[in-house]
Regions:
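C-terminal helical subdomain
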Residues: 2-3, 184, 235-283, 293-297
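Rossmann-fold NAD(P)H-dependent dehydrogenase/reductase core
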Residues: 2-226, 308-314
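Charge-dense, low-complexity polyampholytic segments
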Residues: 73-77, 268-281, 311-316
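C-terminal amphipathic/interface module of NAD(P)-dependent oxidoreductases
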Residues: 287-316
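Alpha-helical packing segments of well-folded alpha/beta enzyme cores
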Residues: 60, 191, 251-254, 299, ...
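Alpha-helix initiation/capping motif
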Residues: 114, 181, 244, 288-292
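Short, flexible, mixed-charge acidic loops at enzyme active sites
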Residues: 164-169, 223-230, 270-281
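A short C-terminal helix-loop "cap" of Rossmann-like NAD(P)-dependent dehydrogenase/epimerase domains
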Residues: 172, 227-239
């Protein structure tokens, strides 16, 4: 009796084909999201850039097409900071099914004062977490129509040292930009893991995976005309950082693997291999601050109340 050939090791430079698949990348016009889109486009997948800025989306698509002959890439207007606008995204996609969504769009503020979305939510929590929570709700019919869709949540290494304050999710009492950012990304990661628990309990074919890019710097990122320009000064200044960190092209690798690799399972956490900061994508143990399912369930309930929608409402 012959045995199946061993699965070859994952190679970020020789990705499997994904012809016929449709993937939405929020914030796909810049940064890590751009490189997620570029790398997925090279597999033959149809990649949709979710962007609030049409001009930047056009530049990103032009860059991808220049590097990937025959790339199937287009854009939809998408602003995760505007909850009401997300209702129309599924229709705007113009597809019968969605094989994956990469929840990548986000905002990080370095300095006070505290800012809010048009819906009255703290800007980072509202954009990074609540927007993607609500978007998932509206995308669920398309995701459920695919044979084995994946929801990929882009977390952050900045979340690893944080704890959620469930009584101050909007940072009204304690607003420190870096802490608030880390907590917003932690909320996102809790969502991704809790969503998978609910998907599994309902017997859904959709899986939810959490990833993070490690330490991904602009100064270590290759140039893409119209999207990102790397100067000689930036290259020189970034040399010491390259020992521990990486560019945003490499920060995209965990998300790309989570979309494409059949060995990746829902409820897993993936990040860079070397200390969680750089290198090839690999599976990590779920962080200790993500292990409390009671916290995750309470966050889910709060998110449902704040957005008025529930991504798991129609499961089962």
């Amino acid at each position: 009796m012959s045995s199946a050939p061993p699965t070859p090791p994952w190679n970020v430079r020789r990705l499997p084909r994904a012809d016929g698949s449709v993937v939405l990348v929020t914030g796909g016009n810049a940064g890590i999201g751009y490189f997620v889109a570029e790398q997925l486009a090279a597999t033959g997948a149809t990649v949709v850039l979710g962007s609030r800025n049409p001009a930047k989306a056009e530049n990103a698509m032009a860059s991808i097409r220049a590097r990937v002959p025959g790339a199937q890439v287009r854009a939809v207007r998408l602003d995760v900071a505007d909850l009401a606008s997300l209702r129309t995204v599924a229709d705007a996609l113009g597809v019968e099914r969605l094989d994956a969504v990469v929840h990548n769009a986000g905002v990080a503020l370095d300095d006070p004062p505290r800012q809010e979305t048009g819906d009255g939510h703290e800007l980072m929590f509202g954009t990074n977490h609540l927007g993607h929570f609500a978007l998932t709700h509206w995308l669920m019919p398309l995701l459920s129509a695919a044979p084995a869709a994946r929801v990929i949540t882009m977390g952050s290494f900045a979340a690893k040292s944080e704890r959620l304050d469930l009584d101050d999710l909007q940072s009204r009492r304690d607003y420190r930009p870096k802490r608030t950012y880390g907590r917003s990304k932690l909320a996102q990661m809790h969502f991704g893991l809790e969503f998978d628990r609910r998907l599994r309990a309902a017997g859904s074919t959709v899986a939810s995976v959490v990833v993070h890019p490690g330490g991904a710097l602009d100064s270590l990122t290759p140039s893409r005309p119209g999207v990102h320009t790397k100067t000689a000064a930036a290259r020189l200044g970034a040399a010491p950082a390259a020992l521990l960190l990486q560019g945003k092209h490499a920060g995209a690798w965990p998300a790309v693997r989570a979309v494409l690799d059949p060995a990746v399972r829902g409820g897993q956490l993936w990040g860079p291999r070397a200390f969680g900061l750089r290198g090839e994508p690999h599976r990590e143990p779920v962080w200790a601050n993500l292990a409390d399912t009671t916290v995750a369930a309470r966050l889910w309930d709060a998110s449902r109340d704040l957005t008025g929608v529930d991504p798991a409402a129609h499961l089962g």
